[in-house]
């Protein structure tokens, strides 16, 4: 029973670490988008189609993806 608890605890910690890494990667992209000049074209891929969006729309899309992954 103790081995199972240790295993589950390790697995939970690993999942938490991976989630944090993913959030950091998303945050790096968001920071990059924020640094772009106004009027710069930004394209995102949604369901295999590339769509031109504003900088703010791209940031909001990434934030929604972060929330989706956390759920």
UniProtKB/Swiss-Prot annotation:
One GO BP: protein folding
Highest taxon above the source species: Archaea
GO CC terms of this entry: prefoldin complex
Disordered, as annotated region: 1-20
Pfam family, one: Prefoldin_2
Entry GO MF terms: unfolded protein binding
Protein name: Uncharacterized protein MJ0647
Species assigned in the record: Methanocaldococcus jannaschii (strain ATCC 43067 / DSM 2661 / JAL-1 / JCM 10045 / NBRC 100440)
């Amino acid at each position: 029973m103790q081995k199972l608890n240790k295993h589950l605890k390790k697995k939970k910690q690993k999942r938490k670490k991976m989630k944090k890494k993913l959030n950091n990667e998303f945050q790096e992209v968001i920071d990059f988008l924020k640094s772009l000049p106004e009027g710069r074209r930004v394209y995102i891929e949604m369901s295999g189609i590339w769509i031109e969006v504003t900088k703010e729309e791209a940031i909001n899309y990434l934030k929604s993806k972060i929330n989706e992954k956390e759920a």
